[in-house]
């Protein structure tokens, strides 16, 4: 048996960590009073004979501070990188609440002239465009452990595993659901027509390009697959004149950096056809396919109004998902002798309009 903490610690240390090892490691860094009352535990498994629960109860505050605030915060931060959206996570967003995203245009070619008298110190201007993204998810999740649950945790290894996993699973499941929702909403919301200013100071209206899927046709799934193959290949071709992103700048996305975010219904339609789209085996394709339950119909300004997305082909850098804060801590409620623990997750979710993106949609009656 193992729980999320011991599994994580085993992976970090390269050796099998048991619950007894975990409890002894907490004791090693505990206060003198804690160490005086709670001996170094012997044996391989938790049971009534090896774990003096009454002594643990006296030092419950210190125990929970170590288990939840110190160890738990480290483990849960690592586990957030194991959910299916982890591929879009980048470095931690540490300072401020605004991120500047910069695109540097390719340099223009010049014709070589051996007799040129142009000064080598002439300033060669660099065309740069920028977007700004702000911190937009500051969430926390709360759970309460009753005294009876804590008592049962020290009955056996299995009970302790259940206790720890109950603490983490509920929080991580809720957080993952909300991250999925944030990504799904951001993809849909960016179908609106946006107004940007070009380098020359002119206003430009941009939006994400889409392809309609005609579900009235018998072979609409084949058409969808062929369209996906076409767009996937176009993403890989560098070009100064053909663009696959809303801003309209040269960019290319290698096959291995492409991801398909698709509704559950259309995912089942495609099945093996997805492998053909990416020219690889089905298992590899599934690793780059992110299935969401569904997309809502987009209503807003622009050509995409009334369109219901079913899939987005994006690059690994399209979705901006940066953690600002991942923290967990517990506090005891002396009135009813319970422990409330809180999991804070602050992060930024946004979409890069410089990266290649295309979507497929249906039009409902």
From Swiss-Prot:
Cellular component per GO, a single term: virion component
Location in the cell: Virion
Residue positions assigned to the propeptide: 1-48
Major subcellular location class: virion
Keywords of this entry: Late protein, Virion
The organism's place on the tree of life at top rank: Viruses
Function: Assembles to form an icosahedral capsid.
Protein name: Major capsid protein
The organism of origin for this protein: Streptococcus phage Cp-1
Gene: 9
């Amino acid at each position: 048996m193992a729980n999320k903490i011991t599994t994580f610690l085993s992976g970090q240390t390269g050796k099998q960590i048991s619950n007894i090892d975990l409890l002894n490691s907490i004791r090693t860094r505990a206060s003198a009073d804690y160490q005086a009352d709670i001996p170094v535990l012997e044996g391989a498994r938790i049971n009534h004979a090896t774990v003096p629960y009454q002594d643990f109860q006296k030092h419950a505050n210190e125990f929970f501070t170590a288990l939840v605030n110190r160890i738990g915060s480290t483990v849960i931060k690592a586990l957030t990188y194991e959910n299916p959206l982890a591929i879009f996570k980048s470095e931690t967003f540490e300072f401020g609440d605004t991120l500047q995203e910069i695109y540097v245009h390719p340099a223009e070619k010049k014709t070589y002239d051996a007799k040129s008298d142009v000064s080598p110190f002439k300033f060669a201007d660099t065309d740069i465009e920028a977007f700004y993204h702000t911190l937009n998810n500051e969430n926390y999740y709360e759970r309460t452990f009753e005294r009876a649950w804590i008592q049962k945790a020290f009955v056996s290894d299995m009970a302790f595993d259940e206790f720890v996993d109950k603490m983490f699973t509920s929080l991580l499941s809720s957080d993952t659901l909300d991250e999925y929702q944030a990504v799904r909403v951001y993809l849909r919301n960016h179908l609106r027509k946006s107004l940007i200013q070009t380098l020359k100071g002119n206003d430009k209206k941009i939006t994400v390009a889409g392809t309609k899927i005609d579900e009235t046709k018998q072979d609409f799934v084949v058409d969808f697959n062929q369209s996906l193959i076409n767009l996937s290949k176009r993403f890989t071709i560098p070009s100064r004149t053909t663009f696959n992103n809303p801003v309209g700048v040269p960019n290319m996305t290698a096959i291995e950096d492409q991801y398909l975010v698709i509704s559950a219904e259309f995912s089942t339609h495609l099945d093996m056809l997805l492998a053909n789209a990416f020219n690889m085996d089905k298992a590899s394709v599934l690793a780059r396919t992110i299935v969401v339950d569904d997309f809502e119909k987009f209503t807003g300004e622009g050509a995409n109004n009334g369109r219901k997305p079913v899939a987005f082909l994006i690059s690994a850098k399209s979705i901006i998902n940066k953690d600002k804060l991942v923290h967990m801590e517990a506090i005891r409620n002396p009135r009813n002798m319970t422990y409330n623990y809180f999991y804070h997750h602050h992060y930024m979710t946004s979409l890069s309009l410089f990266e290649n993106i295309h979507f497929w949609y249906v039009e409902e009656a």
